[in-house]
Structures are given as C-alpha cells and as structure tokens.
C-alpha cells in the first residue's frame, strides 16, 4: 500500500493481521515514491545500527520551495502552480502543513530504530508561513530552504533518546538536498557499518 497515513497510525495492527494471514505487507510506495528507501531500511540495513535519517520526503513542498527559491515566486503563486501541474491537491494541507512528511518520518524511524514510532510523536512545522524574505535571507547565508524530516538517536545523560522532527531547514547550497528540484525527494541514512547512504529521485 502507498497509504502512509494508514501505515504510520495503524502499522502494528496491520503487520499483526498480515502475520496471522501468513502473508506480507508491502509499503515501499508509502515513503519517497520510487526511491527504494523502505526496502533498504527493512532489508539490507536491518543488521546495522542506524544513527540518523534525514529526508526531503514530500514532493509538493519541495516543488513550492524550489519555485520560491529559483523563480522568486511567493508562497501562494508557487502553490497555485503546483496545483495546476498536478503536484498539489486541491486541499494541500496534508502536504504544506507537514502531516505527510511526519507520517513518513514515523515509518522510517520505526524501521530504523527497533521501536514503533507514533506519528503523533513527530513534531512538525509546515511551510505555509514562509515568505520570500525567508528565502532571500537563506540565500544570504549560502543556503536554500527545504522541508526536512529528521530522526536521530542521541545519548543524553546516559540514555538513548530518539529526536524527531519535520521543519523548514536552511540547507547549505553545496549539499545534495539543495540540488533536488521540483517534486524530487531524497533521503540520507547514516549507519555504523554502512556509513552514509543517499537515496535520491522522484517522489
């Protein structure tokens, strides 16, 4: 299934139902479209220790932010163009307010860190309040603005703490995320044995 909201909110029940039916639940399309990040996290990286995930996992918001960055469009102009081209829904709130990216962050985190992560535990901030001034200020700092989903396992006072979030982020212009144009997606996975892996492509 490509229904990321369903997987993120009812995952344990769905996996148990699949187990009882002696079948498998496939959900590669639920995160980052054609990019095989779910396959990697649930397969080749399963025996590794993932330390951090960072991703641009929503094509709608990336298209809007790219239009604001490269063409100087304001938020409403960029959103309208995204809708006209079919990259945004008539009601874009799930995308532009960060709900979609939060669900994908929860799914990737659940696969990576050995614990089920509820979508409600992922703090989120969307892009609806961003202005052309914000984009210009980022450019002055040598950065572009991207909506980034992030999950990191940290040591805090001797305890392993999972830090999660989805928010607009200043990304250095020479970072691979900065080169993702239009509705493209990208995910970076940092693991102890495998090192840093990049998954880039159409979302």
Predicted regions and their residues:
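Rossmann-fold NAD(P)-binding glycine/threonine-rich loop
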Residues: 3-43
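NAD(P)-dependent dehydrogenases' Rossmann-like dinucleotide-binding region
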Residues: 50-60, 127, 199-201
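Conserved phosphate/anionic-ligand binding catalytic regions in large, soluble enzymes, centered on
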Residues: 55-63, 97-101
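Substrate-binding/catalytic subdomain of NAD(P)-dependent oxidoreductase enzymes
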Residues: 68, 77-179, 184-186
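Gly/His-enriched, cation/cofactor- and phosphate-binding structural elements
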Residues: 178-192, 196-203
């Amino acid at each position: 299934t490509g229904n990321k909201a369903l997987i993120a909110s009812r995952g344990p029940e769905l996996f148990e139902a699949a187990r009882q039916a002696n079948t498998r639940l496939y959900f590669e399309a639920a995160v980052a479209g054609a990019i095989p990040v779910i396959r990697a996290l649930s397969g080749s990286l399963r025996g590794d220790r993932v330390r951090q995930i960072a991703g641009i996992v929503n094509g709608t918001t990336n298209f809007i932010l790219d239009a604001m960055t490269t063409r100087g469009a304001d938020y409403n102009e960029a959103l309208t163009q995204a809708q006209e081209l079919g990259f945004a829904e008539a009601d874009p709130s799930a995308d532009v307010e960060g709900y979609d990216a939060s669900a994908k962050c929860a799914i990737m985190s659940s696969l990576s860190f050995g614990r089920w992560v509820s979508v409600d535990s992922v703090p989120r901030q969307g892009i609806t309040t961003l202005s052309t001034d914000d984009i210009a200020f980022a450019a002055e700092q040598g950065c572009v603005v991207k909506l980034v989903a992030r999950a990191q396992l940290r040591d805090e006072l001797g305890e392993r703490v999972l830090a999660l979030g989805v928010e607009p982020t200043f990304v250095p212009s020479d970072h691979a995320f900065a080169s993702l144009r239009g509705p493209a997606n990208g995910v970076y996975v940092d693991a102890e044995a495998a090192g840093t892996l990049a998954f880039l492509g159409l979302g």
